[in-house]
Regions:
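Conserved pre-ATP/AMP-binding loop-to-beta segment of ANL
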Residues: 34-37, 172-196, 203, 229-235
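Conserved AMP-binding/adenylate-forming core of the ANL superfamily
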Residues: 35-96, 113-118, 168-171, 211-212
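ANL superfamily adenylate-forming
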Residues: 43-48, 52, 137-188, 296-344
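Conserved AMP-binding A3 loop
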Residues: 53-57, 192-218
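Structural core segment of the AMP-binding/adenylate-forming
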Residues: 72-73, 100-170, 547
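Conserved ATP-dependent adenylate/AMP-binding module captured primarily in the ANL superfamily
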Residues: 79, 110-142, 217-237, 267-281, ...
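Conserved AMP-binding/adenylation subdomain of ANL enzymes
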Residues: 215-235, 242-344, 354
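Conserved ATP-binding/catalytic segment of the ANL
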Residues: 409-477, 494
């Protein structure tokens, strides 16, 4: 199929026709259900994180107080205000306060280096910035921020009141009528936010998203995923960086759907936060869920139950695959029942014990991971979208789940496969433009109504979309063979020891790979085998190479011989946002890795 359109339906909800701004949602929430717990605010404690309830009425009052401060500070309608923080309650509070004041939010990853930060602040012409810590404030100043001319507030300010308290005090003289004029003057077609893309290969581009983009995209998404919000006590825990479009959509969707929302600032604290927050569903990128499974595997190994966990994992995957075939044999059924009681129930408890579904986006989900989660009773609903499409374009649904695909287009959305295999998208959620970048806008939106996504994929006869890679990730070997690097990398990363993988081979005689290991998984693996010393002393260890070879073999089994990884090198390093090899959404910065590991790549072709 070359094109598939999901027709708009009345079920897409009233949000698709909203005329005002996103701050209206908070006002309506407080008017309709003032005492409902809209948020649970994280507070660290000696025995783990605690949570304090924030009602819809309290949240609205706080939003108004901060919005008054922004107005008093001279922030005008349409002005850009930058937010730079980890994931926390105050981000959502500030986001809505900025919209209530008629301004535009510009999210910045807390890990953004100075050069990228300078670009975003200058390109957006932000008039004010709110950062989490004094250290981030220093980074903003280092980027060239004109301190005396533009406001800079710090949430956790050691030398004075934090940003929220300072803005609240500043806005005491702003009356209700003036504040309400700001909110009610916002129209759906006004700009809500400028989100800068991760910039895996070049300067980040600012995606201009309107209030209408969010209203219409979320109207369709919430209607399609209504089963997630059916529980009266539906709740979810935000694990994504708030600068990610997916996170912004989650926060907005939680308010629209009356879902209790919590925030966790660090994936390393996620297990403890899940245990105390106990969400009914989760949303995140695949790497988050891979880490949760790896943590469960390591815990089982430390308790002497590693082999049982591995056997249960294979049972879960086979169970899910059997569901796809429509036939579960009696032996598999009995084994699944046993492993569910002994192992899977414990994994579900690691998710908080109440989690019924997981929604994954932002990066490709490996099929093994998808089958594993469905096999343990917590299906992953994989979707697809971009910053340019206000997140979701397609999504799998609980009753029409097809693992290995990203689902069907949302109502009112069309997906087309171009002649060169690129996926094109049309719908009300597509961005207006790239901020102050006519050339890039014309390339992405050439005037025919279709957004060029840069992704390559296919559509089956029932409208399910499969993303096979990025156009820029297609390698062409000297024999002329096209290789989808991303798909191979994803399958190598399925191995619990592997953290990251970069497939190379463009203009080369064969395909090869650089592999890094998960530090925690490697530490457990090495301890079990009595290996001492740093990883750098063991990268050529026969047993370790055999493990990585198994990961490579599993990936190679899915492609032709000409596309298979022929050689690999295990690196002693860990790639991260901090060291620059990964974006904040945990995607590879290919140009950075190629530049830093040029010698290692050359060794693969010696």
């Amino acid at each position: 199929v070359r094109e598939y359109t999901s027709p708009s339906t009345a079920a897409a909800g009233p949000d698709t026709d909203r005329r005002g701004g996103l701050a209206d949602d908070v006002v309506e929430y407080a008017a309709e259900q003032p005492d409902r717990v809209a948020f649970r605010r994280r507070s660290p404690g000696a025995d783990g994180p605690g949570w304090s309830d924030v009602t819809a009425a309290t949240f609205l009052a706080e939003v108004r107080q901060v919005a008054r401060g922004l107005v008093a500070a001279g922030v005008r309608p349409g002005d850009r205000v930058a937010l730079m923080s980890r994931t926390r309650y105050e981000w959502t509070l500030l986001d809505y306060a900025i919209w209530h004041a008629g301004a535009v939010g510009v999210p910045v990853y807390a890990t953004a280096p100075v050069d990228q930060l300078r670009w975003i602040l200058e390109d957006s012409d932000a008039v004010a910035a709110v950062v989490e810590t004094p250290a981030l404030g220093a980074r903003v100043r280092e980027s060239g921020w004109p301190d005396g001319e533009r406001h800079l507030w710090v949430l956790d300010d050691a030398d004075g009141p934090g940003a929220v308290a300072a803005l609240t005090e500043l806005g005491r003289e702003v009356d209700d009528e003036r504040l309400e004029r700001r909110r009610t003057s916002v129209q759906a077609e006004d700009v809500a936010t400028i989100i800068y893309t991760s910039g895996t290969t070049a300067h980040p581009k600012g995606c201009v998203l309107t209030h209408a983009n969010f209203h219409r995209g979320l109207g369709a998404t919430l209607a399609e995923l209504h089963e997630l919000f059916a529980d009266e006590d539906a709740s979810t825990l935000m694990v994504l960086p708030m600068a990610h479009v997916f996170a912004r959509v989650v926060q907005l969707g939680a308010v629209k759907a009356r879902v209790t929302l919590g925030h966790t600032p660090d994936v390393r604290t996620l297990p403890a936060d899940l245990a105390t927050f106990r969400p009914t569903f989760l949303l995140g990128v695949p790497r988050v869920f891979e880490r949760l499974v790896n943590a469960a595997s390591q815990q089982a190994a430390s308790e002497g139950r590693g082999r049982l966990f591995d056997a249960a994992t294979e049972t879960a995957i086979r169970w899910s695959q059997a569901l796809d075939r429509g036939r579960v044999g009696p032996v598999l059924r009995a084994r699944h029942t046993l492993h569910d009681r002994l192992v899977h129930a414990r994994v579900r408890e690691l998710l908080g014990g109440r989690c019924r579904f997981v929604v994954s986006g932002g990066a490709p989900l490996g099929e093994r991971l998808g089958h594993y989660f469905r096999g343990i009773g917590v299906p992953i609903l994989e979707g697809y979208g971009l910053t340019e499409t206000t997140a979701a374009v397609t999504v799998n649904l609980p009753d029409t789940l097809r693992i290995g695909t990203v689902g069907r287009p949302l109502p009112g959305t069309s997906v087309r496969v171009a002649d060169d295999g690129e996926l094109l998208v049309r719908g009300a959620q597509v961005m207006r433009e790239y901020w102050q970048d006519e050339v890039s806008t014309a390339q992405a939106l050439p005037g025919d109504g279709w957004l060029r996504t840069g992704d390559v994929g296919e559509i089956d006869d029932e409208g399910f979309v499969r993303v096979t890679g990025r156009k820029k990730e297609i390698l062409v070997t000297t024999s002329g063979k096209n290789v989808a690097a991303g798909a191979l990398e994803e399958r190598v990363r399925d191995h619990p020891l592997v953290d990251q993988c970069l497939v190379v081979g463009d203009g080369r005689p064969y395909v090869a790979a650089l592999v890094t290991l998960d530090p925690e998984a490697y530490a457990g693996w090495a301890a079990d085998r009595g290996l001492r010393g740093p990883l750098s002393a063991h990268t050529d260890e026969e047993a370790l190479r055999a493990e990585v070879q198994a990961a490579v073999d599993a990936a190679n089994a899915t492609v032709s011989q000409a596309e298979a990884i022929r050689r690999f090198e295990v690196l002693p390093d860990t790639w991260s946002e901090e060291t620059g090899e990964l974006t904040a959404s945990l995607k590879l910065r290919r140009n950075v890795v190629h530049r830093r590991y040029r010698d290692a790549v050359e060794r693969l072709y010696d």
